């Protein structure tokens, strides 16, 4: 080759040189006319359009040779640079120009210049003065009155600023190309196939079109072809170059013979399969392998079994080095030969090499950081990796053929990091919530549950022993059974953690378990299920630290397996008990359904109600049967029924599954088109169970639900992975950068309640966070936590038990670090149990913690017409402490009950009560007093503990008469605005009048109270679903209930659940039916109805007014004369985050989003 280098073949024009130039020499195509680069006018934001200030549509018209663009108006009146002209207008202007105007130099200011195509764009871009443009846009963005134009100016400014930032490197006019590059030939190869055909890269095809059109255009220009033909050819050249760079971004992509869009330059770079994500970031790496996993019960928690052939290959270079050092071989080549032959000396060296050199195990999909952990390898025979059973939960692994990848950390730093941070025995806590994640499961739990369960009449029950040893001897001797309740002197710790020795009633099995428990934890004397074990492990970590816990876990793992094996727990079909009561319950169910059907046929209930009642009936039958079944199972064989033990311990199986085995299968899902709402359950349930066997029809119905479940899961995984990816993308730069940012701001935290059920207690929400202020006990006045201190378990418990309802804590949302966040604002690192260290990537941890459980969330949006979500609110509100009652915003009317005792009825909607400690003047409890409550105390009264302060109706919202007089109903017409319903107990003849939605939107049902002269004193609007308590013409006293609105109908609409809800919150999307929100505090007055909208006016105490139009289809959440606060919804629907931001400011939005996601 050297001899012929540089010689060019005279036949084919190829130069003789080395092969590698085929990979590095670029070519180019010189274009006859400039061409705009598609990346700069087809991408969003449209860079060229933003710089020139031309709309995208018009820009396309210029680029694709449809319109002329004025570049310099010259002497022509009424034209500006950048205006568009049609062909006719252009020719007219040319004709009207003074003689010789077109012969002037281009820089003469009076010359008229207009061009078409990319040339015009090139000239316009050359004339852009970036600094001047930037100045103008800034002025516009700050001064312009319209929001739309302000936004537009800011978007343009971004593009302008990026060009200004790269001044000297890039000019705007370079977005138009005169030359296009061609990538080296080896990267778009042409391979001859046998048969004389060629397999070619798509790029060649696209490039060919560019060259053909370019050459044709050159020929036409030389031949002086007419403008029309030239313009068409130029347009085609522009299109060819567009598809060469990006063939997917526009309609009408170039197709190949097989009608597949050709893959352009951009397509091969972008997306998951593109060059970056597939080949640069997603490379396969050396020093790695993968194999099937099997369970490894022998290794310790930080070890895994590695097949020796795999290890020999992974550690090959290390082994070769040792072979050379020991002088067994002289050259690397011979060393490699020995390693390949796997000679006996290789295994010795391998044992030596792997000491202290951990491997990383990874199971796909890696949803959170515990999906990759480090283990110390042990060489094993066979070809499968042995995984420690306790590590399975973190990897979400099981042994039904899962595979795992092994990677080898090479550098000393990597090895150190793997040993210190990633070793499996250090990762016992889940970083998402601080709960132990290495919890024994399945067999281990079953074994431990079995030996800690007591059996009253077992052999040796009631014996007393002076110590553990004696009891063990008796057990080994067969004098006492493992389950027998016996009394033993044991070592324990008291409440303050001091060691004591006392007599407890326990069993031999529990003594065995306590042998594994580290000292200082105390004697654990209870039956062990999965939940109990999780709590114990958490407790052991707190008391003894991670190292001791790892040993404890290994010990209980061995004990659990051993005992599950010794217990010989299995079950057979006769363990599946079918309750005798099953038939009678089913008969009762059928009887009820018949009654419901006859009610429906007689027209007492609507079809929807019939459906709901039938579903309720069968659900009730199912629950009853399930309860009986569980009771029977738990009593069978003194609680030693294998199925019951497996379920009760949490090892395997759920109540649901056992119910299907021996109760009834229950209601099944209905085959549905996706996206249609309506009834999701078939109303005739499957009444057989798996023990009895299903009929063909029942089997067929079952298969539908099963298949739907599987397909949902598959869809869910992809959706959830994408959510995680977006979360990591936005949060990866949030890192703990300093110890303390010194902010004085924080978030006020209180417990989250749904109705009256506490979802997250105050203890959970403040544990491990840092308090902003001193937290003072309201009763004693002592400081529980100083400002800037971490709230630990002890302090959190004191706060939880005291009357304190909210604590202001430091939060990442209010942190004032310049970059990242500070340790004080973040609080405790949940995976370690102490304050977070500098450098922790808390953003990614947070993203993973939300993304990882995403697969368990549901995918669908539930369409439920108000499910009466059993609102278990109390009727009475009691004082929890003695103190003085204070009430804000109270409006009441006086009323008397049947016995004539006076009480007060609250008619304000914003009454808030507080009970205050007499001495420290600190608030002990706060509570909202709902409208219509009966109040038993006056503000300023002293209340005692457990006094009833007020009573309210938890099941109905009410409308209260605020005046005395006669009732008059307006627009209340039977079967138009109200219907009559009969109670299910028809014989009693109890009728109810219920307001319905009328077709006539102008009717608005209301009730007025008139005085003796017939003047209207008060008018109340009647919402849909309201039940009358009084009738027309009745006389009422103040405080009487006029109308009841059942609360179950108040909860309605779409309950967006699961994954879509989380996505919706993070993107702060505006919901489909937003609620209308009050912007100011004030009194409500309802205006008249016009065009199907009701006018609502809010007047503040200062006289400020705001008007809102609320569609009649929406339910009003307020009544005439209510007092509302800013940010309260006036109609049903979801509150838009944007509204909260506008009305209550950024902190409220943060609260709303955080609480929403945590739900």
Curated annotation (Swiss-Prot):
Keyword Transmembrane in annotation: no
Keywords: DNA-directed RNA polymerase, Magnesium, Metal-binding, Nucleotidyltransferase, Transcription, Transferase, Zinc
Domain of life per record: Bacteria
Top enzyme class: transferase
Cross-referenced InterPro entries: DNA-dir_RpoC_beta_prime (IPR045867), DNA-dir_RpoC_beta_prime_bact (IPR012754), RNA_pol_asu (IPR000722), RNA_pol_N (IPR006592), RNA_pol_Rpb1_1 (IPR007080), RNA_pol_Rpb1_3 (IPR007066), RNA_pol_Rpb1_3_sf (IPR042102), RNA_pol_Rpb1_4 (IPR007083)
Keyword Transcription on entry: yes
GO cellular component, one term: DNA-directed RNA polymerase complex
Catalysed transformations (reactions): RNA(n) + a ribonucleoside 5'-triphosphate = RNA(n+1) + diphosphate
GO BP: DNA-templated transcription
Positions contributing to Zn(2+) binding: 741, 815, 822, 825
E.C. code: 2.7.7.6
Bound cofactor: record note: Binds 1 Mg(2+) ion per subunit. Binds 1 Zn(2+) ion per subunit.
Cofactor: Mg(2+); Zn(2+)
SUPFAM superfamilies for the chain: beta and beta-prime subunits of DNA dependent RNA-polymerase
GO MF annotation terms: DNA binding; DNA-directed RNA polymerase activity; metal ion binding
Chain positions recorded as Mg(2+) binding sites: 398, 400, 402
Function: DNA-dependent RNA polymerase catalyzes the transcription of DNA into RNA using the four ribonucleoside triphosphates as substrates.
NCBIfam families for this protein: rpoC_TIGR
Family note: Belongs to the RNA polymerase beta' chain family.
Subunit structure comment from the entry: The RNAP catalytic core consists of 2 alpha, 1 beta, 1 beta' and 1 omega subunit. When a sigma factor is associated with the core the holoenzyme is formed, which can initiate transcription.
Protein name as annotated: DNA-directed RNA polymerase subunit beta'
Organism: Porphyromonas cangingivalis
